[in-house]
Amino acid sequence: MRLVSTDGKKMSIIICRLVVSARRFEWFNVSKELSIYRHLDGKIIILDFFTYCCINCMHILPDLDVLEKQFSVADGLIVIGVHSAKFANERDSKSLLSAIQRYNITHPVVNDPALTTWRDLGISCWPTLAMIGPTGEVLAVFVGEGHRDELVLFVNVALKYFKSLNKISERDNVPLQLARHLLPVTEDDSLLFPSKLEIYLNEQREMLIVADTGNNRIFIMDTNGDVDHVVGGPNPGFNDGDFHNAKFNAPQGVCILGDSVYVADNENHSIRKIDLRKKMVTTVVGTGVQGHDYVGGKNGTDQALSSPWDVAIYKHEHCENGMVPVLLIAIAGTHQIWALFLKDTTWWKNREYKAGTCVAIVGSGREENRNNAYPHAAGLAQPSGLIVVQEKKMLFFADSESSAVRSVDLRSGRVSVVCGANRDPTDLHDYGDCDGVRHAAKLQHPLGIAWHLEEQLLYVADTYNHKIKKVDVTTGYCKTVYGDGKPKETFSLNEPSGIAISPNKGLVYVADTNNHSVKVIDTRREVITTLQMNIPRIDVSDGTNNVYTFDTSISEKGGELTILLKIIFLEHDLKLNSNAPQRWSVNQSSGGNAGWVATSTGGPLSNPLVINVLEGIGIHEVPLILDIIACKATECLPKKCSVVYRVHQKADASSVLTEEREIVVK
């Protein structure tokens, strides 16, 4: 922060120039451009010089929100965002509109693509806040993030002082019209700014995890779009709990280990774990508020983080325990890569870490494009996408602000360039859109990265070029393959930020962020389609408390499936009332057309459900409702649970099957 003593008349001219020249540009969040005489005269003005790619610019948005809630326009304060783009793509007003919507910016914003006001005021870095007095004088300039307390103090003092001089206007006629009203209407099965994807295999199906960032939730579905679980959403929050009550805030990267999905809960500055078996969400790292630690070493929720953007699992060779899992975390806020040790681990240079310890392992914390054999001497620039290639013992990452793909040797910690960026480690402005080798290749703020197992190549979401590119990690050759009308006109993307590749089908799944969709690219047929999601419509108007989905397989020739259901309560003082009816019922009306018939439409929970599956192929859904009475010492509670049993008919499956499934009830 610095105080400014300057010619008030000159500054007033500069502010007038901002407003007058801005008529040639575009305003956002207002119905018409602001006038210095009708709207800004007699106000304390905070000019926020930002570029929407910048993590530090994102970090001050909560500070501005606090400021605007404490001091209204009628009180004499108005905040104006002056978008001063770093990247070429950011100069486009459509791209800026999406960013304003994505980050829920609610104050007026003007797009200054030529950086006219930036130069007039001598601004030198993002973000910078200029505090302007009611007659055009610059009162203070705050450079960088972390000035919330000073901002509140200065605005409070300035308002009191200028009110005593009768120079503050209480007029509140700013024509606000928020950009969010232009967003598509979000339905239960639609996405809003999806960011990251992960593919995994369970016993029966190829599964897809989607971070529906704008709706603050996670979808667990198969790669055909059939949704098993919706976790969190739609409003932001920071709550652990079951899938319905848990809350995220702009979740980004996802990865899976066993039955656990790890989530980079970006704006909660934490790592969350989704337990698919227990159907519960817990916080494993982070305090819920932004940290400023560049070292780490604390355990779990005692360790503060700063804007985790992606996560990946590495199976580290441990001399005593064999392979131990380590969760790698792209910490965009401090320009580092951290590790959460899920078990006791001997790490690089024989450092010992206890299970639950979270520590910085790569990056000095300086925003640079500096490669180095020593991991803590390397400089990263907002790492935003991670992929572990286990057989190579390598981590590859999309280093967004250096516009590069880089690597970490997970045996030693050496950081190297794969492609993109400049040879000068301090030059973070060498971006473009060019195929080539190593530094000759140019990218523009890449965010997503995946490994194509069959091709042995990286696929990169080159976000601000709206393209997907292939990278040979041995030669460093980078080539555009999809997007911006290539290979066909139908291949059009808008800031893709996540990518995942099916190891079985060879399909590429892309989080097409600003198009609010997941695109599926068939690389063999060169066809691109939009993934249609299907959420089973469960009628919960009758008080259904929980929804459960299970999968099983039976022969294409048909057969008999016997299902036994066992109730388990998370609350230890809950138990089934032995004197009350505990029943299941099945919707028989959907069975005949679906290729199955139940031998009974209902019965006590102690009796199995028997399904006769007819000869055929495909997937059949058997819907069940469980009506149970659970009791504590002093009260009994009725509960309804909805179960969707998916029966897959396969050639190599058994024709007679008995299964016992656990229903975990909160």
PLM ranges: what are they?
Residues S21-I45, E68:
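A short beta-strand-turn-helix
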Residues S35-M58, V79:
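Short active-site neighborhood of thiol/selenol oxidoreductases, capturing the structured segment around
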Residues H59-R102, P113-T117:
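Structural microenvironment flanking redox-active thiols in thiol-disulfide oxidoreductases
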Residues L97-W126, A130-I132:
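Short, internal strand/loop/helix patches
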Residues S169-S195, G225-A250, M280-D310, W347-Q382, ...:
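Gly/Pro-rich loop segments of beta-rich domains
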Residues I199-R205, I256-G258, I313-V324, V388-K392, ...:
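Residue-level detector of Asp-centered blade-edge/turn motifs that repeat once per structural unit
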Residues R525-E526, Q532-K666:
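Extracellular/lumen-exposed scaffold segments
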